[in-house]
Amino acid sequence: MIGALGDIHGDFAIVRQIMARHPEVPFWICVGDLADDQGRYEPVDAPLYWIKGNNENFDAIASAALPPSLPFVPNGVVTTIDGIRLAGLGGTFAPNWYLTPAADLPHPRKGSARATELADKRRHFVKEEVDRCKAMTDLDLFLTHEAPRPYRVHGGRGPDAGKTPINEVLAAAQPRLHLFGHHHEWSNQVRQNVRSLGLDAVSRSYLLIDPQTMRFEQVTR
């Protein structure tokens, strides 16, 4: 089994409780937003592979100053774990920064920690990363922070919050299963002939996934 978690937002105590309930799960995955409000990461009791959300400590990610139990999955890179091919496209979509090379995304220092966080454009994904993902083949799991289109929040009554580049990757790469977060709502849909699941906040539910069939069970807390 593979365990899958939605946005954590520093709630590592709950993550450890979930892991303790499932000692049979060798590793876990997460769709981003791990850090707490101070940008801190805590060790957990099983390997937790994760992509970036828009609320992270991007300096810690860049310097690999992370607990060993939290291996980071960079955008547009395939990671193989126990035979499972995993890749991700973390962060959010910003049209004004989409064509910027990832290495050139600015991260200026501001007068406060919050202002510095908001000014850090490393929270976004860019086109060069999307293109790398579109060229991937034989993916088992594809993780994103953003949702594909159409995705309507608040039970379908809100505006379309999905992002077209996610659909482009799903259409090109055709992973066996797609997981996303960011909206803290459970959803189950098919996009571009790919099963696409929106994960709830980790405080409410998580998934157990059969790596052979990609069938899943949503477990509520």
Set out the residue ranges of the language-model regions:
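Structural motif
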Residues: T80-D82, R191-Q192
